[in-house]
């Protein structure tokens, strides 16, 4: 962890639900990715942050900033919507970490939106990716991407076996 996030606690399910509710309320185009995306699909992988992939636009930055103002420490107040158009991922270190991703494993919101699916999380609609879409975000050689890729490949094989593909 970097020095800016050493004071953050791990994100909880309650944090995820509050964040997704706020993103939905602000009508943010987003896709939940990473460990919590696996969780909403029914697979468990240890994670400490919440990763959301958003379009790399100023408009998206404005909406995301508004949505993130629900975070307890209001760290999002320092975000500049113009940063989003630059395409670099943004880490918001508040009470818990939110990684606002503008690219993931070489993929963007626009290249992945065809894999978008909505999953119900205790009555909250969550915009995320299908398992195939999530696998596309795990094509790097980082240790956690390699392990995530193995989990996703096994899950996809199970789904295919059950559907007769």
What kind of region is each of these model predictions?
Residues 1-165:
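Compositionally biased terminal segments of proteins
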